[in-house]
Amino acid sequence: MALTLLEDWCKGMDMDPRKALLIVGIPMECSEVEIQDTVKAGLQPLCAYRVLGRMFRREDNAKAVFIELADTVNYTTLPSHIPGKGGSWEVVVKPRNPDDEFLSRLNYFLKDEGRSMTDVARALGCCSLPAESLDAEVMPQVRSPPLEPPKESMWYRKLKVFSGTASPSPGEETFEDWLEQVTEIMPIWQVSEVEKRRRLLESLRGPALSIMRVLQANNDSITVEQCLDALKQIFGDKEDFRASQFRFLQTSPKIGEKVSTFLLRLEPLLQKAVHKSPLSVRSTDMIRLKHLLARVAMTPALRGKLELLDQRGCPPNFLELMKLIRDEEEWENTEAVMKNKEKPSGRGRGASGRQARAEASVSAPQATVQARSFSDSSPQTIQGGLPPLVKRRRLLGSESTRGEDHGQATYPKAENQTPGREGPQAAGEELGNEAGAGAMSHPKPWET
């Protein structure tokens, strides 16, 4: 077996089998130069190696080459066969071990993050773990933390890359995204100013790095804050906050645009306008509400609700306002669908009209009796008197709820409801609430 030969060879030469491979199936007529060229073409682009020896295998009547690798076998890139004279030559390596694969990925991850196994052991408190629980190569690093302090170049999360070019390359960030990450991570770094500056320069490429090198050459003691201020002046947004405010104030809804869609488009402009302004969150909410009332054409119900909030000085925040607007839009859509479903044909309208008039004439005496009973009881209710504050609250409550019930007026009237009874009764109720009237006039019977 080729694998057994590989293991025996590694034991005989005291080598790690994870850093060795065996190439078998080499024809006997291949010279040493041909073998070297073939192995170089197949392995050199992938990893550094060294040929340690050759031998003859009686099982397949071919030669075998034993090769030492500079690093452990990378199973993702190493081919299982390489093209050579007489066909493909088989590459034999030690089978993949799940634990070895995990440690390999962990090492690559820690290398990219600028950390090591020592940092992991210190963070997890694993310095006193038994030797059999860790790999032999990891143990010297795990035992070292109590003996030597960590370096400043360790224990940090690397920043994203920023170059300052007009079109960022793949893997690079825009200045706004890069600056946001720097502002978030910088306070976490408990290191000296020199180390912070080194880490900052480590994330720069292209024109941004050239500018920072010039600034550092002119001032060796330049701080990270000064570096960021310089980058903001060069690559940051040049727009003044007054221009942002003007752009916000000039923003209007497009033709046919929903109120909720316009609010989504307006919010980034508002946040940008107030970013550098001395305005509180409450002022921002009030500005948003007043701008919608001034610029947007909306339904009377929605406008009544928003104007009531404006008058009371209780502006909703962005999420509350969005919920209010979308609920109103959903109600309008539902109302439109119901209107389309309830549209009768011309013949049906005539029949329903005759039926309504017939039922109205029958129900008129009953309506008169009900109105008289309400008229007799109304003085007792109103003459007790209501405080003016309660009356104003009821008026505000009626104004606020009128928008919520505005859809009821669009539905057809009930068949047993007379068309002439609503007007006087409603007018009398409003008059009694506003002027404190003690009684209501009796409605006259219907004339047939």
Swiss-Prot record:
Keywords assigned: Nucleus
Regions annotated as coiled coil: none
Tissues with expression: Expressed in the brain.
Domain of life of the organism encoding this protein: Eukaryota
Stored Pfam families: PNMA (PF14893), PNMA_N (PF20846)
Start-end of Low complexity biased regions: 352-361, 426-439
UniProt-annotated location(s): Nucleus
Region (Disordered) location: 335-448
A single GO molecular function term of this UniProt record: identical protein binding
Segment forming the signal sequence: none
Composition-biased stretches (Polar residues): 363-383
GO CC terms: nucleus
Biological process terms in GO annotation: positive regulation of apoptotic process
Family, similarity comment: Belongs to the PNMA family.
UniProt xrefs under PANTHER family: PARANEOPLASTIC ANTIGEN, PARANEOPLASTIC ANTIGEN-LIKE PROTEIN 5
Record protein name field: Paraneoplastic antigen-like protein 5
Gene symbol of the encoding locus: PNMA5
